[in-house]
Amino acid sequence: MANTRNIALNVLLKIENEGAYSNIALNNAIKENRLSGVDSSFVSALVYGVLERRITLDYIIRSYSKIPLRKIETKTKNILRLGILQLLFMDKVPDSAAVNESVNLAKKHKLQKSSGFINGILRNITRAEVKYTLPDENDRAQYLSVKYSVPENIVKLWINSYGENNAEQLLASLNGRAKICCRVNTLRTDADTLIKKLSDEGVVAEKIPFINNALYLENTGSVERLRAYKSGLFHIQDASSQLCVNFLDAKPRNIMLDVCSAPGGKSFSAAQYMSNRGRIFSCDMFDHKLKLISAGAKRLGITCISTLLRDASINDTALPVADRILCDVPCSGLGIMSRKPEIRYKDDLFSNDLPDLQYRILCASADNLAVGGKLVYSTCTLNPDENNKNTKRFLEEHPDFYGIPLKLPNGIARAFDEEPYEITLMPHTCGTDGFYISLFGKKASN
C-alpha cells in the first residue's frame, strides 16, 4: 500500500524547495507511484489543502509553538502543516490517524527530535476546545489574509483595486478545485455528440451557458486517457480563455498572430472559429513549447497553424500584417490561484518589470495589425498595473487605435466600473478563472 502522506510531503518539499509547479509535481508523483484513484485523490487533497491554507496553517503553528516558525526545519514544518490540515480541515480523517501518521512520517525522515515536537503540538490541538482564533477583524488585511490564506499584499491590492466586498468574495472563491472546462473541436464533432461520447467513458459533461461549444467536465480522471481526447474531439481550456478568443472574432481566411501562444489553446480555438481556413502564426520564445503547439494542432486535425520562434517584445517587420492579433501576455497569474495555489507565495508578484514587458509586447504586436483589424490584450491576473493601466496607457500613446465595446453574453457581468472595451472576469461573478480581456481596433492614420 502506498504511503500517501509521504508522497504528499515529498511533493510539497519539491514545490517549496525547488519551485516546482504543483500540478506537474503532483501528476508526476501519482504516475511514478502508480497510485489508485482513491490514493490519488487523497494525495491531491493533502497537497492542495496545504498549499491553499498555508498561511492559516502557519498561523496556527505559531499559536501553539514556542519555537519561532522561521526556525522550524522545512520538513518538520510541512509535516505539521499536513497534520493540522487533517485535524481541522479534513473531516474524514480520524484525529488519531492524523497525529500518529504525522509522528511516523517524522520518524521515517529520521527527524527523531522533531517527532516529539510534532506529537505535542498536534495533541494539544486535539485537546483544545477552541482550536484557533483569527486576528482582530478590525485589521481587515491581516484578518482576511489569515482567514483565506492569501498574503497581505495581495489582500490590500484587491481591496484597494476592487473594493472590500469584491475582494472578500474573490478570496473566498480561491480554495477548492476549479472547474475543468473544455472547448469542443467543431472541426470534428458538435457539443451534443461529444457529451454523449464522454458519457460513454463515465465523464459528466454539461454545456457552459454563456459560450457556445464549451463544456464543464466532471469525473474525468486523467484527461489524456480518454478516447474522446485521443481522437482530438476537444481540448482543455477554461471558459475565460474561450471568451477571450470569442471576443477576437476570428473569421475564415483571416491572417492571425498569437504572439505568446504556448501551450496553444487559444490558437486551437481560433482555428475552429476560422473553420481551419486562413493562417494562424503561433509564436513563442522556446522551441520545446512550439513543439507542444504543433502536437496539439495535429491531435485536433488543425492545419492552418504555423509556429514561429520569436520574442514578442521586439518589433518584427518580417511578420505579416494581420487581421487579428492575440496578445495573451506573460503575467503574475493571480487569477488562476485556484488551479495553481502556490502562485500566491511567489516573491516577484509585484515586479515593475512585468507591466513594462507586457506593454512592450502590446506595442510591438500592434505594429502588425491591419487597418480595420482587431487586437485582444489579455492576462490571467487580477492586478490593474498589468491590466487596465497598461491598456489605458496604450490608447493614450497610440491615437490610431481605439477601444471596441465588448458584447458581453448573458451571465457575464462586470464586478466594478470599467471601460466598455474591457472586462475583468472574476470567479465569484462569472464562474471563470480571474482574467482580463480588452479589445482594440485600428483606424487609418491621418
Residue ranges and their predicted role:
Residues 1-446:
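S-adenosylmethionine
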